[in-house]
């Protein structure tokens, strides 16, 4: 499963920001 940690670690800060935006759109915040 993908997490903010794994996304940030594997892809970089831009991936973390993108993931946050994704979560926000789905109301997972």
UniProtKB/Swiss-Prot annotation:
One of its GO terms (molecular function) is hormone activity. It is found in: Secreted. It comes from the Eukaryota. Pfam families: Galanin. Contracts smooth muscle of the gastrointestinal and genitourinary tract, regulates growth hormone release, modulates insulin release, and may be involved in the control of adrenal secretion. Belongs to the galanin family. This is Galanin. The gene is GAL.
């Amino acid at each position: 499963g993908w997490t903010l940690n794994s996304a940030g670690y594997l892809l970089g800060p831009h991936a973390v920001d993108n993931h946050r935006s994704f979560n926000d759109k789905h109301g997972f915040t």
